[in-house]
Regions:
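Asp-based, Mg2+/Mn2+-dependent phosphohydrolase catalytic module
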Residues: 17, 72, 95-196
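Active-site-adjacent beta-strand anchor residues
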Residues: 64, 85-86, 146, 166
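N-terminal helical cap/lid subdomain that shapes the substrate entry/recognition surface
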Residues: 1-68, 77
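Substrate-recognition element of Asp-dependent hydrolases with the DxDx(T/V) motif
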Residues: 2, 70-96, 109
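Alpha-helix N-cap/helix-start and coil->helix boundary motif
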Residues: 24, 28, 64, 68, ...
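Short, flexible loop segments at the rims of nucleotide/cofactor-binding pockets, characterized by
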Residues: 57-62, 86, 162-163
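Non-catalytic, surface-exposed connector residues within folded enzymatic/regulatory domains
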Residues: 13, 21, 43, 61, ...
């Protein structure tokens, strides 16, 4: 989808390493920072990205091994589970529906199409707001973010919560440790064993 979005600008992105940097941060940031687009061009590129992502790209992703079992184990343990993503909320829900996981979660919070909620900290703040509205005893002190890129760890730090990293994701274990994760687990089984 990133390649498709960049075609009109003559920007050709190849290889996994070059494309991986687009996973995690908001598209607006990525297109201006990594591709040198102006704010106006980035907005047009986001529209083009979504032209492909919504009908096609959303169905090309795969669930990491063990994620379903972890979500189910956390649910059985009574944990409140909220997905927070820099992707637009509607697309997050689409992906979760594809994997039949939407009903397993308590809330899904993503970026807004108008740019009001865009960065990880903005998404987290919206998640905190919703949790406080839904759960009288909600406390940030009992909240942890599980993530796979430094954007997750940075957002957690800025939001005043701990981040637990997973080493098999897009950032890798070293990135998560360097970003300040309080723990890093190499697979879902180890994560479940540590937290349930």
């Amino acid at each position: 989808c990133v390649k498709y979005a960049m075609e009109p600008y003559g920007i050709h992105l190849e290889g996994e390493k070059e494309l991986r940097k687009f996973i995690g941060p908001p598209l607006r940031f990525s297109f201006t920072t990594y591709c040198g687009l102006s704010e106006e061009e980035a907005e047009k590129a986001i529209v083009r990205y979504r032209e492909r992502y919504i009908p096609i790209g959303v169905y090309e992703c795969e669930l990491f091994e063990g994620v379903r079992e972890t979500i189910q184990a956390f649910k059985e343990a009574g944990y409140i589970q909220v997905i927070t993503s820099s992707k637009p909320e509607a697309q997050c829900r689409q992906v979760l529906e594809k994997f039949d996981l939407l009903t397993e979660l308590d809330e899904v919070v993503g970026a807004s199409h108008d740019g009001r909620i865009d960065t990880k900290i903005e998404v987290l703040q919206e998640a905190f707001r919703r949790m406080k509205a839904q759960y009288a005893d909600f406390s940030k002190e009992q909240t942890v973010l599980i993530g796979d890129t430094h954007y997750d760890a940075d957002g957690a730090k800025e939001g005043g919560i701990d981040c637990i990293g997973v080493g098999y994701g897009f950032g890798g274990a070293e990135e998560m440790w360097n970003a300040g994760a309080v723990a890093v687990y190499e697979d879902q089984k180890a994560l479940r064993e540590a937290l349930v």
